[in-house]
From Swiss-Prot:
The TXY motif contains the threonine and tyrosine residues whose phosphorylation activates the MAP kinases. GO terms for molecular function: ATP binding; MAP kinase activity; protein serine kinase activity. Residues 43-329 form the Protein kinase domain. It catalyses: L-seryl-[protein] + ATP = O-phospho-L-seryl-[protein] + ADP + H(+); L-threonyl-[protein] + ATP = O-phospho-L-threonyl-[protein] + ADP + H(+). ATP binds at I49, G50, R51, G52, A53, Y54, G55, F56, V57, K72. Belongs to the protein kinase superfamily. CMGC Ser/Thr protein kinase family. MAP kinase subfamily. This is Mitogen-activated protein kinase 5. InterPro entries: Kinase-like_dom_sf, MAP_kinase, MAP_kinase_CS, Prot_kinase_dom, Protein_kinase_ATP_BS, Ser/Thr_kinase_AS. Activated by threonine and tyrosine phosphorylation. Activated by the MAP kinase kinase MKK2. Activated by the MAP kinase kinase MKK6 in vitro. The modification Phosphotyrosine is found at Y203. Disulfide bonds: none annotated. Autophosphorylated on threonine and tyrosine residues.
């Protein structure tokens, strides 16, 4: 089965040379006006490969292992508590999670002096591209590609959920790929424990992949939110178009109900809020669309699985474990090669009263685990 894909990056292959600073212990680069200052073991040239709301990413070479790696710079990481917590959360989670379908964190680069710890540089394994870029490209994708992508997403999610963690921000750009189609889940900055019930005010996950219970501000959400996101991604791989590209919350719910039909009273019992139930009941009513007509390129086993993922009531939505056992993935499913995490992840470090300086200290301590401080 030929699964190779071509690399696709937005920023080209521009190589940028560096200059040695701090007595030769660090390389400094100017990347499109962004200062990059990293340990001298990450040798030039480096090349920019991506930018986003939470950082700028460059590829470089680790001179000790001769591997090409990705370095994400989070600028002014401790200027506000929300971003600082996000950075700490992602570092701690990726150190805890060890799975073939979860991106590997390799290093955290510290500045020479603790008082200069303003920007955070996180080193990851390098992947060639992401699913968003592949979907938007002219790269041909067949059903084998789709099966393999979906299987790896679910395999990684099974492990993540078994660690008592919800990703909460699954979308094509957070699914990294290499040229032989190996897939890794990234960006755990919004992750939460499965047992939390408090609604997250900083929740900023991309609206298009957001489950109905989140759109309706349900305070008690479960791992089913990630399954909904996977369903949206599954359909997007097949059609090369976002499934529910809502312009706002109201439009998002309208697009959802136009496809899967307006929920009946029994499907709203998961909503504790009487106001939320009343709101949904007063929305325009839509019948359920025929999925075979809506997705003519999908075979019957793919449609069967998609329908089970896109269920309004999270209680009735298929679980990751059940999805892995579905006929659509039977050629890939192997229970003995779908590991779970041996230990639950604890978010105990997230003290709401923590200051930016206290969070900075915790991130500094994380960096020490990768690079112990020199003994005096």
């Amino acid at each position: 089965m030929a699964k190779e894909i071509e690399s696709a990056t937005d920023l080209g292959d521009t190589n940028i040379k560096g200059v040695l600073v701090h007595g030769g212990r660090y390389f400094q680069y100017n990347v499109y006006g962004n200062l990059f200052e990293v340990s001298n073991k990450y040798v030039p040239p480096i090349r920019p490969i991506g930018r986003g709301a939470y950082g700028f990413v460059c590829a470089a070479v680790d001179s000790e292992t001769h591997e090409e790696i990705a370095i994400k710079k989070i600028g002014k990481a401790f200027d506000n508590k929300v971003d600082a917590k996000r950075t700490l959360r992602e570092i701690k989670l990726l150190r805890h999670l060890e799975h073939e379908n979860v991106v590997v964190i390799k290093d955290i680069i510290r500045p020479p002096k603790k008082e200069d710890f303003v920007d955070v540089y996180i080193v990851f394994e390098l992947m060639d591209t992401d699913l968003h870029q592949i979907i938007r490209s002219n790269q041909s994708l067949n059903d084998d590609h789709c099966q393999y992508f979906l299987y790896q997403i679910l395999r990684g999610l099974k492990y993540i959920h078994s660690a008592n963690v919800l990703h909460r921000d699954l979308k094509p750009s957070n699914l990294l790929l290499n040229s032989n189609c190996d897939l890794k889940i990234t960006d755990f900055g919004l992750a939460r424990t499965t047992s939390e019930t408090e609604y997250m005010t900083e929740y900023v996950v991309t609206r298009w992949y957001r489950a109905p219970e989140l759109l309706l501000n349900s305070s008690e959400y479960t791992s089913a939110i990630d399954v909904w996101s996977v369903g949206c991604i599954f359909a997007e791989i097949m059609t090369r178009e976002p499934l529910f590209p809502g312009k706002d919350y109201v439009h998002q719910l309208k697009l959802i109900t136009e496809l899967i039909g307006s929920p009946d009273g029994a499907s709203l019992e998961f909503l504790r809020s009487a106001n939320a139930r009343k709101y949904v009941k007063e929305l325009p009513k839509f019948p359920r669309q025929n999925f075979s007509a809506r997705f003519p390129s999908m075979n019957s086993t793919a449609i069967d699985l998609l329908e089970k993922m896109l269920v309004f009531d999270p209680v009735k939505r298929i679980t990751v474990e059940e999805a892995l056992c579905y006929p659509y993935l039977s050629a890939l499913h192997d229970l003995n090669d779908e590991p779970v995490c041996s230990n639950h992840f604890s978010f105990h470090f997230e003290d709401p009263s923590s200051t930016e300086e206290e969070i900075k200290e915790l991130v500094w301590l994380e960096s020490v685990k990768f690079n112990p401080l020199p003994s005096i």
